[in-house]
């Protein structure tokens, strides 16, 4: 049994980019495994999010891996227009432009930002994002 970090990063990627192609590819791979293969699916844990997406699949889908990774870690630190997230950038490497993201599920889904701004509409959307991700967890093979 393994931790399924790939599903975790692909769920967060799909949520921010509003593009489910990488997630669908990962779910198709997961569903093609023998029935005796099991994973622990999760949204967040005590660790940072290392954006280890499948770069070959990204290129096949005409997604630039580095630009996509930069979008994700900037989105989840709240530095991208339209971001609802209040996560934190972690371990940025200027030479490789690699970085990781930190934050709770609530912070990354926008609950923290909505509460800080006392924005009931934003809070409703943030809770719906959180529920969407948790619903996916309930139905993914694991």
Language model region names:
Residues 1-142:
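Active-site and adjacent substrate-binding regions of carbohydrate-active enzymes
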